[in-house]
Structure formats: C-alpha cells, structure tokens
Curated annotation (Swiss-Prot):
It is found in: Plastid, Chloroplast. It comes from Phuopsis stylosa. RuBisCO catalyzes two reactions: the carboxylation of D-ribulose 1,5-bisphosphate, the primary event in carbon dioxide fixation, as well as the oxidative fragmentation of the pentose substrate in the photorespiration process. Both reactions occur simultaneously and in competition at the same active site. The modification N6,N6,N6-trimethyllysine is found at K14. This is Ribulose bisphosphate carboxylase large chain. InterPro entries: RuBisCO, RuBisCo_large_chain_AS, RuBisCO_lsu_C, RuBisCO_lsu_C_sf, RuBisCO_lsu_fd_N, RuBisCO_lsu_N_sf, RuBisCO_lsuI. Heterohexadecamer of 8 large chains and 8 small chains; disulfide-linked. The disulfide link is formed within the large subunit homodimers. It is an enzyme of class 4 (lyase).
Length: 453
C-alpha cells in the first residue's frame, strides 16, 4: 500500500449510502443575489419526509451522488453545492410540497441555456425516491442574465423595422400544413398578405419534405412577400422555417433567407435544441433578421401538472436563448391556458421587471435588466369572434396568429384576411374610444361585418 493510500485509509470516512439532509438541506441559508433559484413541485414516494426529498433534489441537481467519494476532499462542496433552503406544502394537495433550491452561479457556463438545463433538470427527474417532480419556476440572477444576448432584436426594434404601431400584429399559418406544392403554397401566402395580414407562417413541421423542398418554398414565399408589399404599401413577412436536421443545414437556410431580403425566419426551439436556437439567434441579430419561435413539443414537457416543467420556465429560457416571437397560448381557442397563469408568463416574456405574484404562478421576482422583450403569439383555434377578447387580454405587443380562422373563410383566403384585419382595427378603434371590449365585443364585430366580407 502506498503511503498516500495508507494515510487516507487512516483518516478515511465511512462508506455507504449518504443521508443528503446532512449536507443539502439548509433552512438557515440566506439566498444571494447571484444564486439561481428554483421552485420544484415534489411528489415523494409514500412515507418519505419532505426534507429528505427536498435535499435530494438539491443534491442530485448539483454536486451530490449517492455516497461520499474521495475527490470530495479536493474541492469545496460548501461553495458549489445546491441548497434546499425552504419547503412549503401545496394547498389542497396532501402529498405534495414546493422545494426551493438555490444554486451557486459558478455551477453554470455563461450564456448557455443548454448547460443550465442539463444541470438543473438533466438527471434528477429520474430519481426513484420521487413519484413525480415538476420545475415550476426559476429566478435568473442579473449576473447570469447579462451573459446572454437574448432576443435578436426585441419588441421596439421589430415595430420600427415593420413601421407598425398601436395595434397587435396579425398572422396566419398556411393550411393544409403538409402536401401543398411550393407554388400553391406561395399563392396562399400572397392572398393572405394581400388581404391585410402582417405575417404568414410555415407550420412547425414544414421543413424540407419531398412535396416541397425548402429552397423552392423560400423562393415562392419571397415572391409573395414582395408582390403584396408593392400592392399594399406595407411591410410584410413570412416565417420561413429554418429548422433542419443539422445546425449546418439550419444556417444554410437562414443565410438564403437573408440573401432573399426577407425580414424574418423561424425555428422550432425545443425540437431543434437550445444550442441550435442560440446559434440562430446570434446570426439573426448580426444579419438583421427577426426570429419567430415555435414551441413544438412543449406539451410533452409542460402539460402534466405534477411532472415536467411549467411553460413559464421554457419561456424564460427562450428569452435568454433568443427569439423575437414565441407561441404562448390563447386563453381562448382550442388549446389549454388559464388566463392569470398565461398572462403571468406573457409578462415574463415582455416586461423588463416582474414582481413575485403567486396568484399568477410567478414564484420569484425577475429582473431582465437590458435583455429585450419577446412578443407573445396567440394561436390555435381562434377566429374573428375571438378578436375582442384577444385584443383585451394580450394588448398591442402581441401577434394574433390565425389559421383556419383566415383560410376557412367561405369566400377564400384573401377575404378571410380582410375579415381578420377589419375585426382587429374595429376592436382597437373601439378600445381607444373607451368602449368595453369584454361587454361590447360581439356588437363591435357585428358593426364591422357591415363593411367587411
């Protein structure tokens, strides 16, 4: 036995499974301004004390492993470990509690959402001592926020680029989402833009399939944009989906969009991945492209109430990674969305500073300092009769994204777009005149119908 090993054996430690609470449960800890704070909804296995599971979450998502190891002595665990500093019951749930965990900033790579999520949620969700685990919210400290570029441009710069103020923007997803040829697809884009929409959109799963290769789609959509701009005198755009199987192909598509001179591209940020998304966001800022973000796959992560991750966390991550728009639910329409909770993460996307407000699901005060805001997109299952509610709920800094609510008009695509635009302008005008959109919305739309298809 070497002298070094002999010395260690003489002053060694007891091997075996550790009790995490001896190290990672620290209710006396006072959080620092530089800590990343997390709120986890924990559903433990029966008979397991909350403290034991709370500290296990802190351990498994930071420096902990199931036993003491020799190399623990080569670093400072007190400096690097996560700490479960508070536990509270979930009202109305006997077997659940919220565990608050603080992580030292040195655990995370600067400017990397990928690394942040790998650390905080990458492993602990499979922990067998837990029946379920959900990340409800994160507090991102200013020191970490400042390491991110964030959205390529932000709300005000986008409005200046488009020269459109004082109202929500209007969009439409081209349908059917799959099966159209590039030429027919471009025709639908033109008809919608010519009818009065600001944007049209590739559906999230339109990439480069045999029936419509990406380059052909980009060319026909660019033609539709320029033709509609010439005829309306307004700046138009189409969300050209740059999502691809490799980052190299994604960037090739973004470069071609820039060469065509179009104003905006699109990315599926969850299926594409945060590293790809941040790369694309940096390119978009450097090259004057707006970036529309689709959240395809989000419900796999956020729909279950007890397990996964709340969308407000994904929304914060997107603001850090970069995107000028993101789909954010509707409150009305065909997708789920509670009004107060939805408006909570809408404010997290748009505002510079958001106070803690548990009634809206906001567990921590969040200061975004100089990080630009993201425009929330209301989409899926909406139509002109929803316009008063959408205008009231989302306000001006939003995109109201129709699909069947435009293309389903019995007279065709262009009349559907006209109906959308007339309804929006009627609601904005009524709101500015002091009318109550919630009470008078139906009447306002019926009045507008007299002057619209």
């Amino acid at each position: 036995m070497s002298p070094q090993t002999e010395t260690k054996a003489g002053v060694g430690f007891k091997a075996g499974v550790n009790e995490y609470k001896l190290t990672y449960y620290t209710p006396e800890y006072e959080t620092k301004d530089t800590d990343i704070l997390a709120a986890f909804r924990v559903t433990p296995q029966p008979g397991v004390p909350p403290e034991e599971r709370g500290e296990a979450v802190a351990a498994e998502s930071s420096t902990g492993t199931w036993t003491t190891v020799w190399t623990d002595g080569l670093t400072s665990l007190d400096r690097y470990k996560g700490r479960c500093y508070h536990i509270e019951p979930v009202p109305g749930e006997e077997d659940q509690f919220i565990a608050y965990v603080a992580y030292p900033l040195d655990l995370f790579e600067e400017g990397s959402v990928t690394n942040m999520f790998t650390s905080i949620v990458g492993n602990v969700f499979g922990f067998k001592a837990l029946r379920a685990l959900r990340l409800e919210d994160l507090r991102i400290p200013v020191a970490y926020v400042k390491t991110f570029q964030g959205p390529p441009h932000g709300i005000q710069v986008e409005r200046d680029k488009l020269n459109k103020y004082g109202r929500p923007l209007l969009g439409c997803t081209i349908k059917p989402k799959l099966g159209l040829s590039a030429k027919n697809y471009g025709r639908a884009v033109y008809e919608c833009l010519r009818g009065g929409l600001d944007f049209t959109k590739d559906d999230e799963n339109v990439n480069s399939q045999p029936f419509m290769r990406w380059r052909d789609r980009f060319l026909f959509c660019a033609e539709a944009i320029y033709k509609s701009q010439a005829e309306t005198g307004e700046i138009k755009g189409h969300y050209l989906n740059a999502t691809a199987g490799t980052c190299e192909d994604m960037m090739k598509r973004a470069v071609f969009a820039r060469e065509l001179g179009v104003p905006i591209v699109m990315h599926d940020y969850l299926t594409g991945g945060f590293t790809a998304n941040t790369t694309l966001a940096h390119y978009c800022r450097d090259n004057g492209l707006l970036l529309h973000i689709h959240r395809a796959m989000h419900a796999v992560i956020d729909r279950q109430k007890n397990h996964g991750m709340h969308f407000r966390v994904l929304a914060k991550a997107l603001r850090m990674s970069g995107g000028d728009h993101i789909h954010a639910g509707t409150v009305v329409g065909k997708l789920e969305g509670e009004r107060d909770i939805t408006l909570g993460f809408v404010d997290l996307l748009r505002d510079d500073y958001i106070e803690k407000d548990r009634s809206r699901g906001i567990y921590f005060t969040q200061d975004w300092v100089s990080l630009p805001g993201v425009i929330p997109v209301a989409s899926r299952g909406i139509h002109v009769w929803h316009m008063p509610a959408l205008t009231e709920i989302f306000g001006d800094d939003s995109v109201l994204q129709f699909g069947g609510g435009t293309l389903g008009h019995p007279w065709g695509n262009a009349p559907g777009a006209v109906a959308n635009r007339v309804a929006l302008e009627a609601c904005v005008k009524a709101r500015n005149e002091g009318r109550d959109l919630a009470a008078e919305g139906g009447e306002i739309i019926r009045e507008a119908c007299k002057w619209s298809p």
